[in-house]
C-alpha cells in the first residue's frame, strides 16, 4: 500500500496543485492538517483536499480558523492571517473542518498534526 502525504498547505493553492502534479498514483492521499492559514486561497485548498484526500486530520491553524482556539499563542502575523481566514472561509468549508478529528488511526499507523500525545506540540530537532 502506498500513500501520498500532504501537510501544512496553509492556503497556498499554487503549491498544493504543484505537489499534486508531482504525486504518482497511490492508494490514497493523507492530509496532516493546516490546510488554511497565511495563504490567499483557504476555500480552494479545503475543497481540493476534501475532493482528493482519503483521510484528513485537523491542524492548529484549521482549528483556529473555526473557533479561535489558541489565537493568543500565534505570532501577530499568523493571528492576523487567521482572522482574515475566518472572514472568508465558507460555512460549508468551516463545517467540514469542524467535522475532522485530531487523529486518524489505521492498523499500520497513526496520523496526527503535531505529536501523538499533544496534537499541536511542535516537533523540534
Regions found by a protein language model. Give the residues of each.
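Acidic, His/Gly-enriched loop-helix segments that form or flank divalent-metal centers
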Residues: 76-125
